[in-house]
């Protein structure tokens, strides 16, 4: 493939080919998987695509440079508040993990492990890769601090006039 657009099309076509029996209407029956495909081809910008079971795909909006698979109602508000085109990679990484923690705490159908990969622009290798479980000390510490910070913030608000 010469660019990530072709890669996304290829992943979508493979998904259709291997997940739908011949003759089945793929517009009404979803048997495939959803993928996030991203990375960089040397000499080109970084790209990110969400590939749907039907084979079609989308790119993130410039103002919201992230994509989410699956249950979005719990962790996405955190991403919406923090992730911008200018956010630092470390902050984006912590935000992604806290977003995932919110989903884990709110939806029993979502669970570990969490596969977490960091790729840095123009490096052409994975900078960091972890498989996190709930007993991971760093992840547990981060999520505990987040919970404490939320409570501290809530307790710092002035009383409501009817209290």
Q: Which residue stretches match the model-derived regions?
A:
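N-terminal nucleophile
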Residues: 1-163
